[in-house]
Amino acid sequence: HTATFNQVVAYEVGRHGFLDQHVKKICQVYKERRDVMLEALEEHMPEGVTWTHPQGGLFLWLRLPEQCDATELFPAAVKNKVAYVPGESFHPNGGGKNTMRLNFSYPTPEKINEGIARLGKMLKEEICANQKIFQGI
């Protein structure tokens, strides 16, 4: 049972249109942060990495070259002070090893750009190392 006070607050927020105002404002904030992330991805991601262009929500998806494993790359990302959610856990029937979910809802635009730059640098280093391994170099 929800507390009566919480019910009254929710009712008043809805009755006075505060929720509509908040949703409009937060949608604009998330759109700005999404756009910052998309621009940073264009600037910093290595060749062979693709990503979604979401029309809503709080996340976008990165797809790495097939030989990459986002779970195996995660410790290198953390070492570079950036984090993501490996996509494999979102694929219940397997697959998704080369995908990652990125969140743009919380970090500031400055932190988004900084984080994507760090992630791009790490991926460039790791993908180059993987390509050498796979090519026998």
Region locations from a protein language model:
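PLP-dependent class I/II
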Residues: H1-I137
